[in-house]
Amino acid sequence: MIYQVFGPYGSAAINVASCESGLNPGAYNQSGASGVFQIMPGTWAGTSEAGASPFNAYANIVAAHQIFVRDGYSWGEWTCKP
């Protein structure tokens, strides 16, 4: 799914998600970050996927891609970098 959504940035996205959550859609951090890409609730609310669960793998990946594009194709929102 990550390759389908991120296209040419798929490998980098896999690296980020692997580091952030171990590719676990059920991952949760005490900070409130959730899902495959460990997206914070406030950031999640600003995506088109806000009505879905952040633990839905596909929704989390789509939201992460939106954040990535919104930020100028930057991984700045994430602790882990490709």
For the regions a language model picked out, list residue spans one by one.
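Secretory-pathway/luminal and periplasmic proteins that interact with or process carbohydrate-rich
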Residues: 21-28, 71-77
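Solvent-exposed, acidic/flexible segments
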Residues: 5-10, 28-33, 53-61
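Substrate-binding/active-site groove segments that recognize
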Residues: 31-48
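Export/targeting segments at the very N-terminus of extracytoplasmic proteins
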Residues: 1-23
